[in-house]
Amino acid sequence: MNTSVLNVNGITFTIYDSYTPQVIYMIIADRLNTTTRMVWFPEFVSTVSDDAPRSGVHSAVDMYMYIRDMVSPSNADGPRSLSDAVQMVKSWVDRDPESNTKFVEHCIIDAYTSNREVNDDVDAQTCVLLDAIITQDVTGNDIHGPEYYREVVRSFRDRCMEHSRNIAANKRLVPMYVTMYSNWSNTTAPTMANMDVEAIRGKYTVYVPEPDERPTVILFNDLVMSEDLVVFAKYGEWLKYDARHPPTADTALSAMSRRTGTKVNNRERNHIALFMVRRGIYSPGMTYDIAHVYPAPGVGYTISVLSNNAPTVDVPRSITTAMGLGGDGIEVSDAGGGVTYTASFVLNDITFVTEYLQHFTLMKCTNKATCIFIDETHLMRHAKEWRRFTISSPRFIYEYNNYTVRFSVTVESTRRDVARVAPYSRIRIYDAPNTNVLYGIANDITSHMIQYKSEELDILKFYTEHLHTDELLNINVRVLRDSKRVKRTPGQLAGQHRQVRRRIQAQRDGDHVDVRSIINVNNYARQCAKLPTVVRSVDLVPDGKEHITFSPGRGLPDVYLYCNHDDAPYPGLAANRLAGNSDEHPFLPCCYRVRRNAAADACDNDSLAPEVRSQTFYNTQRVLPLTAFGKCPGNLEAMLAVQRYCRSTDTNSATFYPKEKVVQGATAVRGAVQVGPNAAIEAVMRAVHCLQSSTADPRSLVIGAEQLERERSKMMEYITCAGQELFDMSSGERLSWLKDNTSYFDPLRLVKLLQYHFDTNVFLYVRGSTVKPVRSIAKTESQRVRLKFYDDYTQAWNDNEDVLSIPYHYAGADYHDMKIHERSVVLYVHSGTEITTLAHPHVEYVLFENHCYITDTIRKTYQALLPQPMRAVYSFVYFDVDDATEEELDVDTANALRAIYYVSKGKQLSAHWRDVAVANSDKTAPRSQTIDGVGRLIGMDGVQLETIRSVEPLPSLPIDNHHHSMFSFHDNMNRRELLNPEHSAKCTYTWYLSKLTRVLLHLTAYTILKKGTLMSELFTVDERRFNLLHDTINSLFEAGVVDRASYMNLLIVEQDRVLTDSVDTARRLVYNASLLLRRMSAYETSEIRKSRYITELLRYETDFTSDESPFSIVTSIDKFILKPRPKTVSLFRPPLSLKHDDTNTVLVQYSVDKHYLSRRVDDAELMRLSDAMRSNTFKEISFDMFDTLYGNGDDADVRERERTSPTLILHVWRNETSSWTVLECTDDVDSEYAGVYFHLNAADPKDRITLKRLTLC
């Protein structure tokens, strides 16, 4: 490599050929303590001052100071010699004309506006100099004139002043673009300014000695600014720097007021609250972006750019937002008696929707002061905001400093007539209580975005470790959730549980019947679990069975009772403790394990009443006393398949399980808890006590009301964990509810408090829910879990209408917290039996014989309900609105569009508008769509939608282009191309292929990236089957349907799992993909390449989702890979035909709206037409038509008029292999009948029409 030597003040540097001039300048500037904007000129430049840095025959000139001095009125010598100045400046401008010309102009304008009043006249020399530099004309001719430059300076200054006022009002809040590098020079200190804005030009790195934890990076925009404008502020105090002398870090901070500094550990922390950068000059088409300011060791703050896909707009007001008080565009409302504020801003990164919100709603912010939840009361909204229709805009709840504020996020795009269209995210904040909260939430949302960007790899690692993706690959479960998504009132759940009651109809006659046939007592089984059997004669008592005589009263004869129970063979009497029947039946017969004194005549008085013993096990669903256990609900045992998994000799000896004989036949029991509002807390405490050792009997644990109140108060620090379940309550209401010890502690809504407070997994089991009960859990060969449900949904379940349930909230958020606790408890929520009267639902705990094993099975079941991706919640459909129209998209149409959009992706949808359900019926769902020449949707059901532009066609909706009035034709050729029936088939192919492309791109990710680890573990089909898709994907790439850059961006944005439920599904996908591509001709593929919607469709909506699992592709291939339109379909009735009249004269007849325009054809013309038909070549026949118009074809209403119609040109084409002929009829230029078609039917129906092969003129 060639080198040269450069001597700078006695130091020799080696210069390589690869060094750019900029690098050489930096080397010299570093040695001579100059900046990189200093330009080195030969010594012949006489205007350079003597104290300028020199190196050999060159001297360094600071162009900024040099040009400012030339036009500065404070210069005693006046401007420099024009010839010298132009020669020197022009030689420097020639090095980089585009950037250096702007720099020179900025220097002159800055000098002029800094040292002169705006009303001063621009002197002639300044005009000549500006002309010479800007026009590159050294002759000095005044081209523009003083007035031109005076307006330039005045507008520049006016815009700066307006910008200052807007910043002071905190209006026009948008992120902006920044790029900064190099260092500051140690120069003089800055000066203070009061809300004034001027530029620091140059590219610098910000140095601050003490890093701020989270600098605010919300940036303000300006319509026209200088090259690089930077403003630093500390709590509203603005600093103005002299651009010639940028300050050091110490001097910059010392100039700021210290009264607003905060102290942490007796150290004052310096905060830089705002900074602003604008790159560009005099261009209304601005570029915005998010800039990230982060602390760096030894440097202070470094500024970097997060992304650069910001929109460019041609009208600044279309992107400018309003934020603050007063002025235009500010929304101030009076909600609930107080003034609230609403504002919006944009983030030019759509990752905010797909990744950021998903992450922060899943994390639930357990240890943070601010949390994000989903507002389930605003799941669908339709509004015309910011001149755009936003059909799907769920709201989120943000908790900030004990305030609950709602915000929404929508994906929007700029106006359709802008050259560069890019989507961005708009955040709208609703009903903030004050401006501090308004600005604080905006700051925090942006800061969270930055946090996510900076910790993206750590977050991905966290999900990989905690979400147990290996266990979720093949799960297909029904989501079981509480059907009532409303705040419960006391006794409401108990009332619901008692709605369905199956009463036992006892038999009234016969032998060997139940004792309840002769004793009419309600809820007999509640007191006696083992009921005796009745016979009329003592001879009917089975041998070996003891019996007693019983008098049923009411004049009935005595009967004999015996017990048909092996574990309770002895009949006896017990005092009747059931309310309402004790007078008629003071004693009730029952079966016991031991003999009792149960003679009927021995029970005449209370002193001889049988002894009442303490019962330790109950077979009914009554509320248990503290000294007893109860039978576990039958459905819970069936669901867990306890006969299969629990009847094992390998029980868990380290966990308590009751050893009483009465419990021997049960593999799961429920434990007793005191009745009260804090029963859920006590149930967890007793269950956790059981898990400590095999001797830790929970019945021995003494828990008082004061202890429960203390535990409840301790949970207040975890209240944010339950924020999603309590989305409909403000932070103050949540705290008040938790502080009130008399209010019901609802485990359905506060389960996460129990989990984090007691460090245990809590699984809820509710009796009385109306969802389909679970029958069992089955394990696959790969040890995954599948749930089975009872087929008979309507059958009666007695008191055991039980389901495994999760707290109610929107399906987009997850139930299971990120932390997997070592211990697990199961809570049983019920309301006792029919006669139980409770103020609140009762909560008990469930113990299993093999507790650890069973709860682990339940945990895997709950993991099947783990978080669905936020993109399943968010499928944005956005429509840009034309400014000139006043038409609004009606609600039915909007909901119908969204319904069709979802149904086309295999999703189930229930649309809501103002709390009124809109069914997906034929009344609201469009039946057809009309698309224009570039594949955009312009009409529905034959009605043009003026208010929407650039809308994606709906793949599942038929295309109908018969409605010609919707189209605006620029020329006749455009009309013929649009009305070509092939066009509909091509557009259909486009949308089928685009959806197919998305799936194939996902499914081949493992093949393309098989050497990496990004997607390799996220598929259930092996490499061999993926290799079968190579040819299909390669054909897509080669055809240009999608490029590899878009494909990689798709992977980066999506990072989604696309799975197949079976090998058959994967094979069917490969087959349909290959079949669809084989059906497409090369011409059709080339047409699809022209569609600009292909890459736009590669977005965030997950295809092939189902109710059971959003991660599985389940037999939904047929929903989008349909058979293409038959090529024999003709969208238009032939308006032109050949026919014979009554005189056997041939007519050429043209029909328009049932009016027939015809002309008789003479023999010569008929012969000429027949010859053309018999020919194998393409021929053209033209003739004038002098016609008679027949009204409705009725001779009685003949109304003749003569006119000269356009010359018709018949293009006749004969199929070389068939006997049929296709004709195309066109006309001369600009005829109203242009572009119509007709055909002559073939003799054989199978040989009719092939429009695909028709060659158009």
From Swiss-Prot:
Q: Which cysteines are joined by disulfide bonds?
A: none
Lineage top rank: taxon: Viruses
**Which key words are in the record?**
Virion
**Protein location:** Virion
Question: Where does this chain mainly localize?
Answer: virion
The entry's cellular-component GO terms read: virion component
In Pfam terms, one family for this protein is: DUF5757
In which family does this protein belong, per the annotation?
Belongs to the ascovirus HvAV ORF146 family.
Name this protein carries in UniProt: Putative structural protein ORF146
Record organism: Heliothis virescens ascovirus 3e (HvAV-3e)
